[in-house]
Amino acid sequence: EYMSKYEHGKIYKLVNDINTDTYIGSTTQPLSVRLQGHLHYVKHRLSDERRLYTAMRAIGEQHFTIELIEEYPCSSRKDLLLREEYYINQSKPTLNTFTKLIDTRTSQELNRDRYLGRK
């Protein structure tokens, strides 16, 4: 039987021991692997100015730890992102750049918004 990688879905948060700033994310990887991915971006993508990476560079990556919020087995990336979005909206983390991860507008609404110059 085929197992989707999304059966290993999880919602996590990055916290630091300097202040109350947090980041919420989702992954299908082990948390230690996901944390290494963030640390790689901090070191190797210096032009990436997302809030999380700017904060990690400013106060030091050694001050950040990753914590599991919820194991969330699901069937698709969309399901996982919707769950992540739920937690972002609940706790309002300060280091997330985006709060809307899934665009739920219909194609008609998207076309209207593009025509009117909205994002």
Model regions: which residues?
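Structure-specific nucleic-acid interaction/processing domains
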Residues: Y2-R118
